[in-house]
């Protein structure tokens, strides 16, 4: 079911909320199969994407519950593609596993609002890449919010595309979070596209645990942001960047 959102109305924006609950998957879980879309009240299952496959899951409306686990094997990719008008929050409340690519694509239909993906604090064995992107170049942008140590072995990529506007891709830290690596350099121009912020008014810790060089050069702790369904907000909390590995920024 497609939900058309009048984004100018706060009530309508607040109604745009998608929850995705992910159980614990393994490489032995049944194959995901073909590209698909969200269905209402989907039962909990576990799936895997292996063998250098590329699979898309389209989100065509808000207010869905999708309970599944996902293993993404090395060389494979899984894309969650938001097809609404934007300004929605998609919660991924569970553990990923594998070494592949998880791409999160936000749709933005209004310049004053961002779309947000929230990855929970559940333990995870995922050591792949999480790539944040958006359709078009609207300044509302896309947000990835993380917390906890579940993604301590994963790398977040905020590099965007060649036509991505600067600072349109945001990594938000809720209290404290760990990552193996962080990248925001556009491979075509070398321009840094990302920004890292606290998700609220409190100062947040971002710990980088990897051993490679971090190619992040965007802003850290900037106070102005687009905050999904709430529109423009200005949190005062900054970021404590903790280099726990042997990597350098």
Please provide the spans of the model-predicted regions.
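Signal peptide processing junction and immediate N-terminal pro/mature segment
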Residues: 21-22
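Bacterial N-terminal signal peptides that target proteins for export
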Residues: 1-9
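Extracellular repeat-rich scaffold modules on cell surfaces
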Residues: 25-48, 64-157, 188-249
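N-terminal extracellular ligand-recognition/capping segment immediately after the signal peptide
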Residues: 50-68, 176
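Short aromatic-glycine motifs in intrinsically disordered, low-complexity regions
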Residues: 167-174
């Amino acid at each position: 079911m497609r939900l058309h959102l009048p984004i100018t109305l706060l009530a309508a924006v607040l109604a745009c909320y998608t929850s995705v609950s992910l159980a614990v998957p393994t490489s032995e879980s049944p194959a995901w199969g073909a590209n698909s879309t969200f269905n209402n009240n989907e039962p909990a299952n576990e799936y895997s994407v292996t063998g250098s496959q590329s699979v898309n899951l389209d989100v065509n409306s808000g207010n869905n519950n999708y309970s599944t686990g996902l293993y993404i094997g090395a060389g494979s990719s899984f894309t969650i593609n938001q097809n609404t008008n934007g300004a929605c929050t998609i919660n991924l409340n569970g553990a990923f596993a594998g070494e592949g690519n998880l791409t999160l694509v936000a749709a933005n239909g209004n310049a004053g609002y961002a779309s947000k993906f929230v990855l929970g604090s559940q333990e995870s064995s995922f050591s792949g890449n999480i790539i944040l992107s958006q359709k078009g170049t609207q300044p509302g942008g896309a947000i990835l919010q993380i917390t906890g140590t579940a993604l301590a072995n994963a790398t977040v990529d905020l590099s965007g595309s060649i036509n991505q506007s600067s600072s349109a891709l945001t990594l938000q830290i809720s209290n404290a979070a760990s990552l193996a690596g962080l990248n925001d350099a556009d491979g075509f121009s070398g321009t840094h596209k990302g920004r890292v912020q606290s998700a609220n008014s409190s100062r947040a810790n971002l710990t980088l645990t990897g051993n490679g060089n971090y190619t992040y050069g965007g802003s850290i702790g900037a106070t102005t942001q687009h905050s999904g369904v709430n529109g423009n907000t200005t949190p005062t909390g900054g970021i404590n960047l903790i280099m726990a590995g042997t990597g350098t920024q």
